[in-house]
Amino acid sequence: MRVLVIADSWLPIPPIKYGGTERIVHLLCQGLKQRGHTVHLMAGEGSMSYGGRLVIHKAPTLAYPSRAFRKLWFQWLSLTVLPDVDVVVNFGRVDYLEFILKTSIPAICRFANPIHQHEIDFLLDRRKGKCLDFIGISKCQVKHLDYSELFTIIYNGVDLNHFDFVKEPVRPPSYLVFLGRLTRNKGVDTAISVAQGAGIPLKIAGNLPENEGDRHFFETAIKPKLGYGCEWIGPVDDRQKNELLGHALALLFPIRWNEPFGIVMIESLACGTPVIATHCASTPEIIDHGKTGFLCDSVNDMIKAAKNLHTINRLNCRIAVETSFSADTMIEKYLESISKYSN
């Protein structure tokens, strides 16, 4: 089939370092190409081609004229590709589909962020009964929506070839790891409290926030605590991530928001490293409490979990990813949705 995949333009496909959704787009495009499909991609500068057409589009600034122009420009770009397309898979903004929804080409809209009802209403209003499918990445992401029954849930996956299973981390000193944006929502301050309470060193990997509020949080709540058994090593690439996760005692995932799916959790499990996570949002769908990690309701619960990591068989973590969260499993489920529209 001829598949057009649309991604936001903020980061290239594949991403260089940070970029969860962009990594999923890359895995899907790569998997479709390997299975003999023609893959066209509309994405940001620096993106690679997957054999079909590569169409570069740019993110707008906040100024209204820029947003209006970029929207029109995107519609024109999509028009140049559509004659060679059997189905569209959109990973980006809902309004990318505005022109496409006026055609007879089937569209699949995959959501990465929390979903607002008005987005679904917008799509259904413009599609008017034509071929339109929705993909969510966790049950918790869609349960509050009208028409939630229209969603297919496809969990994110990881390429197991990029993550080495470590049966037992033996490189001293032992440490916990936090990997993600250094924001309050991600709970990096909680991770520090857990590590200090458990008496275990913490390695923090992630991007320094850019907006003023998150930068203030970093300067006041995180930076003063660095150096006391807590080391911030900055953003990491795939090789460094594999090493960092694989030799950690556990990944700390103390989120404070309804994150639809934290890809870093399955990256950690792929290495055999259990996850200590807040019991909220999608974490119960990913972590098997007591088997592949611990679901916790407080800092004290997380400290206790960090002291009981010896009860986790790391092989169970790897098996969980091989069974439910591999790239191949994910790609085959996307193909089930895409193949409905084969001629």
Q: Where are these predicted regions, by residue range?
A:
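Acidic donor-binding loop of glycosyltransferase active sites
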Residues: 246-260, 273
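Short acidic/histidine- and often glycine-rich active-site loop of Leloir-type glycosyltransferases
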Residues: 279-290, 294-295
